[in-house]
Amino acid sequence: MMKEKLFYLLPLLALASCGEPSYKDASLSPERRAELLVKELTLEEKAHLMMDGSRSVERLGIKPYNWWNEALHGVARAGLATVFPQPIGMAASFNPEMVYEVFNAVSDEARAKNTYYASQDSRERYQGLTMWTPTVNIYRDPRWGRGIETYGEDPYLTSRMGVMVVKGLQGPADGKYDKLHACAKHFAVHSGPEWNRHSFNAENIKPRDLYETYLPPF
């Protein structure tokens, strides 16, 4: 009788072992599931996921994704959206709480747009949930054309505004999931010139200025 039970039980155990992989186990924490998923990736697959346009990994159920999305004063380049004042204008309000409310609204719109595009199986640039926002570089030289993206020349004000932007975009710290993922840019001494920003080395910045002015917002 015991042998007969084992005869029927062993195939069931074998089927159970061939079930959903552990990284799809919803009872595990997101951190643990991510850790398990990364272990399944090959080196080449990991490298492709580091690009702003990530390829799909079909064997693991990972869909393509574009990390390049912007929301400096509203959801950018993804159809109609609410347009708020430029960051330099919001900084002039000296009102961090208002900035939080602005980006809380922005995150709502971004999620709605992402839901729509995903329903159309579209995952192009500017349709995702990872925002290259806020710009917390220090605006010292008015010749820098991107100064309007910043919160001005003061590191303290820039820091306070930057914190509220991130909180508004990502949602409550104790939430189960982030609404969006914010990315403060451009680390660290990026305040012009623009044309050679990928090769320019700001060697004239003194250590004290670096740590007291440019790094605090990050």
Predicted feature residues:
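Glycoside hydrolase catalytic-domain context in secreted enzymes
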Residues: 18-218
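A broad helix-preferring feature
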Residues: 1-4, 18
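Hydrophobic h-region of N-terminal signal peptides that target proteins for export
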Residues: 11-18
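Sec-dependent signal peptide recognition
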Residues: 3-11
